[in-house]
């Protein structure tokens, strides 16, 4: 069952590529994916190509996957071992903690959420305390050099660890491939609802016209 879900999602991502990330599957294990996330434009992470792995549990999609960066990261919500602390990937006691994982979440939504997190960290519950402290000093203009310097170091390191093929992929994607919007699935559902309304409305109009014709007769 897990493989069926993952095959469908992987097919969707390969048929609708994004300039923001690249995914590949472990041929020997469908539940392990390799990912490269592109640092968001106009942020300290711009230009970085950060590698990560996604691991899917046996009961996916009813339990969230795990995303772990293999590239070195300097961020308040990323542990030193690369694990990401973000609500969308929390499963245990999610309802009690106000977390947002649900089986309808898609992989592209997860990846775009992680990319967004890079520039919008949550310092209230940091995974990396030192990075959180440095980020706060940066935001409050107490130290404008330390945090950016560490981030830019990881950006450079991520590029050094990327293959020329991966770098070329993102260069081409930036000019040829539109990004996948994070609300793509919501838009599709809204369109379906609109179409249903139009059909229902037209049917009612036809019934009213028929009634009027009968009255005239």
From Swiss-Prot:
Major subcellular site: host cell
Cofactor dependency: Mg(2+)
Source taxon at top rank: Viruses
UniProt pathway annotation: Protein modification; protein ubiquitination
InterPro entries reported for this sequence: Ub_conjugating_enzyme, UBQ-conjugat_E2_core, UBQ-conjugating_AS, UBQ-conjugating_enzyme/RWD
Major enzyme class: transferase
Residues of the active site: 85
UniProt keyword ATP-binding, yes or no: yes
Swiss-Prot/TrEMBL keywords: ATP-binding, Early protein, Host cytoplasm, Host nucleus, Late protein, Nucleotide-binding, Transferase, Ubl conjugation pathway, Virion
Triggers of expression: Expressed in the early phase of the viral replicative cycle.
Family: Belongs to the ubiquitin-conjugating enzyme family.
Subunit structure: Interacts with host 40S ribosomal protein RPS23. Interacts with host translation initiation factor EIF4E. Interacts with host E3 ubiquitin ligase CUL4B. Interacts with host RNF138.
PANTHER family hit by this protein: UBIQUITIN-CONJUGATING ENZYME E2
Protein name: Ubiquitin-conjugating enzyme E2
Lineage, highest ranks first: Viruses, Varidnaviria, Bamfordvirae, Nucleocytoviricota, Pokkesviricetes
Gene name tied to this protein: UBC
């Amino acid at each position: 069952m897990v493989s069926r879900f993952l095959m469908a999602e992987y097919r969707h991502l390969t048929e609708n590529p994004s300039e923001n990330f690249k995914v590949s599957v472990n041929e020997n294990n469908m539940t392990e994916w390799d990912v490269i996330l592109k640092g968001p434009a106009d942020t300290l992470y711009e230009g970085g190509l950060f590698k990560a792995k996604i691991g899917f549990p046996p009961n996916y999609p009813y339990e969230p996957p795990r995303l772990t960066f293999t590239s070195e990261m300097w961020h308040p919500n990323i542990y030193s071992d690369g694990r990401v602390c973000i609500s969308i990937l929390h499963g245990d006691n999610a309802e009690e903690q106000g977390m947002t994982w649900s089986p309808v979440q898609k992989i592209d939504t997860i990846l775009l959420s992680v990319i967004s997190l890079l520039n919008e960290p949550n310092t209230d519950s940091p995974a990396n305390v030192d990075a959180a402290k440095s980020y706060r000093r940066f935001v409050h203009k107490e130290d404008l050099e330390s945090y950016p310097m560490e981030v830019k170091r990881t950006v450079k390191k991520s590029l050094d660890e990327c293959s020329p093929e991966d770098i070329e992929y993102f260069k081409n994607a930036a000019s040829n491939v539109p990004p996948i919007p994070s609300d793509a699935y919501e838009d599709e559902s809204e369109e379906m609802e609109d179409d249903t309304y139009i059909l229902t409305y037209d049917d009612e109009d036809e019934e009213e016209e028929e009634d009027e014709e009968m009255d005239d007769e």
